[in-house]
Amino acid sequence: MSLGLIGRKVGMTRIFTDEGESVPVTVLEVVPNRVTQIKTAASDGYTSLQVAYGERRASRIGKALAGHYAKAGVSAGAGIKEFPVSDDVLANYSVGGQITVELFQPGQLVDVTGTSLGKGFSGAIKRHNFSSNRASHGNSRSHNVPGSIGMAQDPGRVFPGKRMPGHLGAVKTTVQNLEIVRVDAERNLLLIKGAVPGSKGGDVVVRPSVKVKA
């Protein structure tokens, strides 16, 4: 995997190109991610870069985590995340260093991961994109229901994983191949074309695309 950044979704707006075209963009605020630990194959069995992202008051950090931040010489963050990377990438960073929005360039394609909007309890039609039943002609009170979920006497049970009504949304979601329209290093902002998962203020992970369009 490649190195990415963790930021916060600010919201959506639009910008105009030099030709006057309106482009919808999502604004992400990416406070510089601080390197808290470098893991190598010799010491940890794998290579990865551990970073702290966001900001949090020191009074809200437990002693163990506060000591971890102090050892790295970085300010307290809202959380910690690891990016599995190669030895070549590790060589470019040191503990206590920063990774800024300049990791990305305008025009680059990225994958954005966040927690999708929660939509509460939903039926099987909406939740799993089932087809509705007939509106009339013999259908009585079975218009928008999933139908039978049962089996015969053998096996006599409902198999695990059966798609049923339940909570919709609030799950980890990735949108691939989104284009970075603008990088504002002065204000720590990324402007990404289109929509990204999650609500305003939600954490998102931005990585270089793994399925780059030909």
UniProtKB/Swiss-Prot annotation:
Matching entries from InterPro entries are given as: Ribosomal_uL3, Ribosomal_uL3_bac/org-type, Ribosomal_uL3_CS, Transl_B-barrel_sf
Q: How is it modified after translation?
A: Methylated by PrmB.
Keyword Zinc part of the UniProt annotation = no
Q: Which UniProt keywords apply?
A: Methylation, Ribonucleoprotein, Ribosomal protein, RNA-binding, rRNA-binding
Q: Which GO terms describe its cellular component?
A: cytosolic large ribosomal subunit
Q: Which residues carry this modification: N5-methylglutamine?
A: 153
Tell me the GO molecular function terms.
Answer: rRNA binding; structural constituent of ribosome
Q: Which GO terms describe its biological process?
A: translation
Q: Which PROSITE patterns match?
A: RIBOSOMAL_L3
Superkingdom per UniProt: Bacteria
Q: State how it assembles.
A: Part of the 50S ribosomal subunit. Forms a cluster with proteins L14 and L19.
- NCBIfam families per UniProt: L3_bact
PANTHER family associated with the record: 50S RIBOSOMAL PROTEIN L3, LARGE RIBOSOMAL SUBUNIT PROTEIN UL3C
- What task does this protein carry out? One of the primary rRNA binding proteins, it binds directly near the 3'-end of the 23S rRNA, where it nucleates assembly of the 50S subunit.
Q: Could you say which protein family the record assigns here?
A: Belongs to the universal ribosomal protein uL3 family.
Name of the protein this chain belongs to: Large ribosomal subunit protein uL3
User: Lineage, please?
Assistant: Bacteria, Pseudomonadati, Pseudomonadota, Betaproteobacteria, Nitrosomonadales
